[in-house]
């Protein structure tokens, strides 16, 4: 196993090599520096990955907010269209009621309302086109969001791989922790052995010091005895000097025999005393020589003992320093072990949070997939319904065109018939005036007026023909009214279909907004968990505070901001009106009134 724990800390074996086996410190420092560089690089890579993930999350949040705004605008527009449809429906119902009440007099209003309905239909078509465009844009945004979700899933996979790597590192760290504890126990045992050895050596040295002190005391006693013997030797030397002077006096006074004899006897006595004294002095000198030799040996032993004592002091000081260094190293190792424990706890908590977040993200992604499939199915259904509605609208438009053509042809026929009737009426009026004048002339002459059978039959046939034409005109008017009713019914059907489509689109948009809000809530939870993990890591002093990257750094390219479409407003003064139909309406309806009034006049004249 390597000699490195978390954060590049040197293991216990390295410390043993450092102090027990006399390993060099430069190698250990270089290995620690390399480990620190490696850990710094790994932290930089992890910070960059976190910054990239945070930037991607910020982008996704911004885009989700934009999509929400677009959905809100679309819902507002659909609500406005629904309100317009409701108001138009109420107006149509009011017009229908008025047409039922007014009868023929409400045709003009009905035609105007039909024009207004056509204008509203054109507006609704434009709104449908605009909504379809916005829907396409929203689908594109949904596709982009899906691509971003795939990118986020890739990031999740990379995070899972990092979590697996972290788990492996966690296992390695635990193994290193176990080995470090074993090494700590071994170091403590070695320290106890060293302490015992040092205590034994100190006890032995104390015993030696005591023996040396005793020998020093003995040497002091010997010195005192030597001093006393030296004093005795000096006394004896003075006595010898006196004896020598006495011998000189004896040699000078040889004249006196008695005195000589006495002195000789005394001299003999003194010589015997001197011999004894010289013998004693020689013995004392021998003792002094032996004592001096012993003193010299004692001095040498004292010097050796002093040297050993100084060496023992130095060794004890060195051992104290080593013990202090060992204590400092053990304290450092304990602090590093505590830091490693805290880091392991933080990593385990982070792994639990990341696993929880990964589970939440997987569940949310599965829900989004299911929602996406449901949305796709609903989109297919809505597209089919939109196709059916478009087909119905085209059919109704073709029916409108055919009915308009039929109405125009019938109106042309009515105009021709009116023109022919007007010519016939003019001829009849001229004929009537002429006959009236002739008959007045004849009545002045005679009281009776004679009419030929041909005239009678002609007049009766004309009356029948006029009745038939009047009936045809009434039938045409009734058909026209029925066509108007059918057109109003078709318009009502279209409005109901548009309401259904708008209601479905509103439901879809509400579902999409709910999904977006749910995804936003999930992403906010993820961001809160990441920020909590970030704060814990910053409190532990493991990770520096990364700068927020929210502008330029992007994962999958730059995303242009989606501009919210402005709602279109149509002014009532610029409404497009079909010119030919309005002109004919303005011209033909009064002609119909005139025609029916003339019909009534003719019927009154015939009566």
UniProtKB/Swiss-Prot annotation:
GO terms for cellular component: cytosol. Its main location: cytoplasm. Ubiquitous but preferentially in chloroplast-containing tissues. InterPro entries: Web. Keywords: Coiled coil, Cytoplasm. It is found in: Cytoplasm. Disruption phenotype: Deficient chloroplast response. Residues 66-295, 329-445 form a coiled coil. Disulfide bonds: none annotated. It comes from the Eukaryota. One of its GO terms (biological process) is response to blue light. Interacts with WEB1. Required for the chloroplast avoidance response under high intensity blue light. This avoidance response consists in the relocation of chloroplasts on the anticlinal side of exposed cells. Acts in association with WEB1 to maintain the velocity of chloroplast photorelocation movement via cp-actin filaments regulation. Belongs to the WEB family. This is Protein PLASTID MOVEMENT IMPAIRED 2.
């Amino acid at each position: 196993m390597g000699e490195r724990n978390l954060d590049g800390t040197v293991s216990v074996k390295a410390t043993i090599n450092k102090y027990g086996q006399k390993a060099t410190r430069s190698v250990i420092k270089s290995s620690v520096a390399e480990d620190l560089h490696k850990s710094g690089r790994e932290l930089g890579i992890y910070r960059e990955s976190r910054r990239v993930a945070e930037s991607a999350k910020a982008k996704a949040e911004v885009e989700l907010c934009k999509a929400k705004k677009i959905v809100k605008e679309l819902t507002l527009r659909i609500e406005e269209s629904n309100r317009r449809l409701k108001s138009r429906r109420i107006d149509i119902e009011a017009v229908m009621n008025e047409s039922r009440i007014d009868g023929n007099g409400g045709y003009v209003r009905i035609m105007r309302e039909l024009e207004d309905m056509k204008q509203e239909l054109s507006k609704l078509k434009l709104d449908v086109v605009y909504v379809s465009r916005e829907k396409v844009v929203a689908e594109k945004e949904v596709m982009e969001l899906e691509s971003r979700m795939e990118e986020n899933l890739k990031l999740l996979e990379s995070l899972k791989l990092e979590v697996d790597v972290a788990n492996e590192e966690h296992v390695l760290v635990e193994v290193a922790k176990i080995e470090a504890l074993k090494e700590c126990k071994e170091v403590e045992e070695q320290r106890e052995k060293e302490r015992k050895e040092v205590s034994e050596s100190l006890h032995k040295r104390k015993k030696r010091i005591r023996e040396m002190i005793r020998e020093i005391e003995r040497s002091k006693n010997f010195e005192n005895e030597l001093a006393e013997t030296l004093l005795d030797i000096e006394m004896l030397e003075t006595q010898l000097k006196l004896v020598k002077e006495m011998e000189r006096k004896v040699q000078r006074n040889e004249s006196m025999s008695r005195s000589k004899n006495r002195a000789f006897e005394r001299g003999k006595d003194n010589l015997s005393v001197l011999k004894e004294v010289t013998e004693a002095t020689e013995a004392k000198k021998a003792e002094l020589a032996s004592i001096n030799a012993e003193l010299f040996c004692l001095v040498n032993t004292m010097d050796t003992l002093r040297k050993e004592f100084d060496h023992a002091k130095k060794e004890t000081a060195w051992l104290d320093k080593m013990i202090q260094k060992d204590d400092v190293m053990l304290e450092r190792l304990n602090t590093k072990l505590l830091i490693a424990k805290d880091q392991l706890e933080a990593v385990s908590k982070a792994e639990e949070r990341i696993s929880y977040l990964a589970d939440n993200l997987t569940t949310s992604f599965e829900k989004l997939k299911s929602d996406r499939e449901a949305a796709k199915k609903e989109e297919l259904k809505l597209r089919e319904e939109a196709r059916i509605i478009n087909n119905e609208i085209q059919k109704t438009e073709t029916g409108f065109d055919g009915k308009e053509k039929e109405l125009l042809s019938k109106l042309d026929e009515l105009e021709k018939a009116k023109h022919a009737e007007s010519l016939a009426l003019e001829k009849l009026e001229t004929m009537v005036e002429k006959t009236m004048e002739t008959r007045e002339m004849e009545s002045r002459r005679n009281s009776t007026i004679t009419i030929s059978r041909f005239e009678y039959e002609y007049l009766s046939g004309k009356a029948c023909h006029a009745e038939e034409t009047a009936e045809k005109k009434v039938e045409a008017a009734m058909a026209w009214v029925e066509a108007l009713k059918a057109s109003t019914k078709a318009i009502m059907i279209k409005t109901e279909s548009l309401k259904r489509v708008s209601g479905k689109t509103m439901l879809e948009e509400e579902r999409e907004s709910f999904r977006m809000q749910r995804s936003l809530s999930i992403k906010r939870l993820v961001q809160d968990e990441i920020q909590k993990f970030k704060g814990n890591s910053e409190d532990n002093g493991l990770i520096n505070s990364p700068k927020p990257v929210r502008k330029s750094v992007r994962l999958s390219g730059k995303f242009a901001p989606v501009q919210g479409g402005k709602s279109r407003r149509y002014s009532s003064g610029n409404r497009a009106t079909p010119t030919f139909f309005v002109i004919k309406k303005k011209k033909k309806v009064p002609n119909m009134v005139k025609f029916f009034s003339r019909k009534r006049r003719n019927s009154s004249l015939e009566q």
